[in-house]
């Protein structure tokens, strides 16, 4: 199984920053009886590995070689690869930069490296043979990509990208699909003149053309670390929850707009 990690963005919400935002220290881990800072993107890699990934591809931009230097060619039980997005051109463009590595018979998971979410085994709840989204309930869905479901509470009918009135509190935090579907989506994106910056609008076109997607309500807590507010929230949530721990966060900051915990 492949994991794709789009990490080519400039991190404008955190500028000026002397290193890639995917390497922001959030929490810590113990290595050889010594605690060391943990880069925020390590949490996504660990979740991908727990979900079955044995190969992970970072999509990086020019000037972000520090990610390669930090991780090298291996992390946990997964081999790492790197491809380059020459200029920031949206999530769709970034993800499809890695498509040549993914065979139609592979399974692929995609997540955002500046987020932390629980449970850390959430990707295992998604099927391997269908396009499916790991959903999280949040208080401010207008800040994210809200996912509308059919009456069966399973099939996706629409993704509402950062709408002021999304009509649901459920957003996607990661998604998974067969490699064949990734290639179908790329073909559709090309047919649409590559105009889709966000995956949500492309998925809506895919659904309109007869495609199928599932939304799995298995997420419990979600933090966007890409803002200072979210960064503080993640530090609070992870202060007693190191990477690799199965424990759920027990506290949440009332100040944090981007931390969401469901009990």
Label each region the model flagged:
Residues 62-63, 86, 198, 220:
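Short beta->alpha linker loops
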Residues 124, 155-223, 228-251, 258:
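Catalytic-core segments of class I nucleotidyltransferases/pyrophosphorylases
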Residues 3-5, 58, 110, 133-134, ...:
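Structural beta-sheet core signal
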Residues 1-68, 78-80, 85:
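N-terminal glycine-rich phosphate-binding loop and ensuing alpha1 helix
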Residues 67-151, 186:
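Conserved beta-loop-beta/alpha segment of the NTase-like Rossmann-fold superfamily
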Residues 40-44, 94-97, 201-202:
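Well-ordered alpha-helical segments embedded in enzymatic catalytic cores
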Residues 1, 54, 105-107, 130, ...:
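Short coil/turn segments at beta-strand junctions that form active-site/ligand-binding loops
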Residues 23, 147-151, 215:
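A structural signal for short hydrophobic beta-strand segments in well-ordered beta-sheet cores
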């Amino acid at each position: 199984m492949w994991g794709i990690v789009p990490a080519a963005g400039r991190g404008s919400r955190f500028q000026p920053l002397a290193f890639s935002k995917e390497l922001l220290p959030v929490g810590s881990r113990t290595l050889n009886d010594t605690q060391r800072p943990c880069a925020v993107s390590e949490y996504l890699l660990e979740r991908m590995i727990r979900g079955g990934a044995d190969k992970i591809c970072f999509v990086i931009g020019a000037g972000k070689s520090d990610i390669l230097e930090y991780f090298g060619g291996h992390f946990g039980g997964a081999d790492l690869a790197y491809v380059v997005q020459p200029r920031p051109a949206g999530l769709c463009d970034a993800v499809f930069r890695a498509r040549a590595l993914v065979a139609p018979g592979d399974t692929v998971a995609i997540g955002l490296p500046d987020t932390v979410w629980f449970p850390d085994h959430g990707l295992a709840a998604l099927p391997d043979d269908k396009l499916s989204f790991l959903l999280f309930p949040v208080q401010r869905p207008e800040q994210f990509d809200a996912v509308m479901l059919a009456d069966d509470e399973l099939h996706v009918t629409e993704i509402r990208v950062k709408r002021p009135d999304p009509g649901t509190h459920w957003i996607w935090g990661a998604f998974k699909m067969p490699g064949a579907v990734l290639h179908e989506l790329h073909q559709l994106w090309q047919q649409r003149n590559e105009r889709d910056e966000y995956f949500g609008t492309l998925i809506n076109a895919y659904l309109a053309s007869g495609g199928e997607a599932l939304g799995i309500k298995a997420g419990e807590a979600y933090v966007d670390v890409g803002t200072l507010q979210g960064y503080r929230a993640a530090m609070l949530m992870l202060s007693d929850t190191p990477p690799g721990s199965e424990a759920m966060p027990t506290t949440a900051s009332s100040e944090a707009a981007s931390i969401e915990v469901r009990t």
